[in-house]
């Protein structure tokens, strides 16, 4: 016999800490406590509200409200999707117009090397970022199954056609070779760390969608938008 104290921030429900939390409710010799950040009188409530806007409701519930968030909780919701009207080298939201020449343009790359029907797609997503509003406009998306020799020519064309400043590629496994070949072709590459699972890496993007700062084009020529929304 003895005593034990278990302290942790909740992280999903498929783990020993959640099971311990649930089981302890009905054990006479156990006590359980939950202390959300707001319970700390030394922390400014305005700072907490600011964190909620920055992190999004899902991460905020876990990190600040000490809630167990189900791993199957949908992190992208359809009513978060917003749209802009493409103009002549501009993006329009209502009466506001954002000039492409004034924005920072880049792309992220999710690589897959195979043309088999069962293989994943290589996805290259181009963005334009307005620093004044922090709005992020999705301007283009390439999605197809590619063999390794076709990746660099495709990436190079997108890099120059969309006037990108850089492309982000994860530095992991065979992708390191892709990074090196891309740099040799004059493509500016920002190496991204793959140090988290895909869901964790998607949470900052989820927060920006929820805050209404990511926009898809409202354009019938952008046939990839529907597929992108379904993938999310």
PLM ranges: what are they?
Residues 4, 32-35, 106, 189-191, ...:
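Conserved beta-strand scaffold positions in the cores of enzyme catalytic domains, especially
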Residues 109-124:
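An active-site-proximal beta-strand-loop segment
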Residues 37-111:
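ATPase catalytic-site recognition across NTP-hydrolyzing enzymes
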Residues 1-51:
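ASCE P-loop NTPase helicase motor core
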Residues 20-28, 96-98, 182-183, 207-208:
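Short, conserved catalytic or adaptor-binding loops enriched in Gly and charged residues
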Residues 17-20, 120, 179-182:
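Short amphipathic alpha-helical segments
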Residues 67, 71, 75, 123-125, ...:
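Mg2+-dependent endonuclease catalytic cores in nucleic-acid-processing enzymes, primarily RNase H-like
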């Amino acid at each position: 016999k003895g005593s034990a104290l278990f302290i942790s921030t909740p992280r999903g429900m498929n783990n020993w800490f959640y099971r311990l939390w649930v089981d302890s409710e009905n054990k006479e010799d156990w006590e359980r406590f939950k202390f959300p950040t707001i319970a700390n009188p030394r922390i400014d409530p305005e700072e907490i509200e600011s964190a909620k806007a920055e992190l999004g409701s899902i991460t905020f519930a876990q990190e600040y409200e000490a809630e167990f968030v189900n791993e199957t909780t949908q992190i992208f919701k359809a009513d978060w999707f917003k749209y802009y009207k493409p103009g002549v080298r501009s993006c329009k939201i209502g009466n506001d117009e954002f000039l492409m020449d004034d924005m920072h343009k880049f792309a992220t790359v999710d690589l897959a090397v195979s043309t088999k029907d069962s293989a994943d797609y290589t996805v290259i997503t181009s963005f334009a970022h307005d620093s004044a509003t922090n709005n992020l406009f999705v301007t283009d998306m390439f999605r197809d199954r590619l063999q390794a020799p076709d990746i660099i020519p495709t990436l190079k064309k997108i890099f120059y056609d969309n006037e990108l400043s850089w492309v982000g590629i994860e530095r992991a496994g065979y992708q390191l070779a892709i990074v090196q070949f891309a740099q040799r072709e004059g493509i500016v590459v920002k190496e991204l760390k793959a140090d988290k699972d895909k869901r964790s890496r998607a949470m900052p993007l989820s927060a920006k969608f929820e805050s209404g700062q990511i926009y898809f084009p409202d354009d019938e020529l952008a046939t990839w938008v529907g597929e992108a929304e379904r993938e999310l």
